Amino acid sequence: MRICAALPEDVPYIVAIEHIPEYRNYIGAWSAEEHLRAMADTDNEYFVVRGEVSGDEATDVTTIEGFAILQGIHSEHRSLHLKRIAVRTPHRGFGRALLEHAMSCAFLEHHAHRFWLDVFETNIRARRVYESYDFRYDGVMREAILRDGEYHTLALMSLLDREYTSRQQPGVQAVTTQSHS
């Protein structure tokens, strides 16, 4: 598995992952043109995770297993947004690897104070993954997304730099200024 910056030629694979039918109620989906515009914007960073192709195919070929988009790279508030993260096949470790890479980039490379995301409230599996990385529940955006004539609520979650640091240094307790129940 290898994580690297996405290239324009990766966009068709990114679009294909976004348009997996099972993801329809969990993530947004852009056109190739929208991704290319976002990729050209220096306030965004795209990452892909490449996995070894196995089976009958050549072993030196890699396939794009997932992607992540960071937004707010130049935020004066040092608040970076995980706009999107998705993998082709769940439960193979690619999503967690992408999330860890995105967190590392946000906090260690871009010196973020806050790393945040929104997730469909009904996406319990994703919410549990984020909670396992100490993301805190910040609130909701009620009925913020309209899909197929039905409104969906988004949960807002975030991780602060001191919480990220305490994860990296076992035994160090993050100081919080607000109770989270």
Regions found by a protein language model. Name each.
Residues N44, H152-L156:
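Short hydrophobic/aromatic beta-strand or adjacent loop that forms the aromatic wall/cage
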Residues M1-R2:
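Extreme N-terminal starter segment of soluble prokaryotic enzymes
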Residues R96, T122-G139:
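Conserved active-site alpha-helix within GNAT-family acetyltransferase domains
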Residues R88, L117-R127, A144-E150:
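Conserved beta-strand-loop-alpha-helix junction that forms the acyl-donor binding cleft
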Residues L108-D118:
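Conserved GNAT acetyl-CoA-binding A-motif
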Residues A5-V11, V15-P90, R96-L99, C105-H110, ...:
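Acetyl-CoA-dependent GNAT
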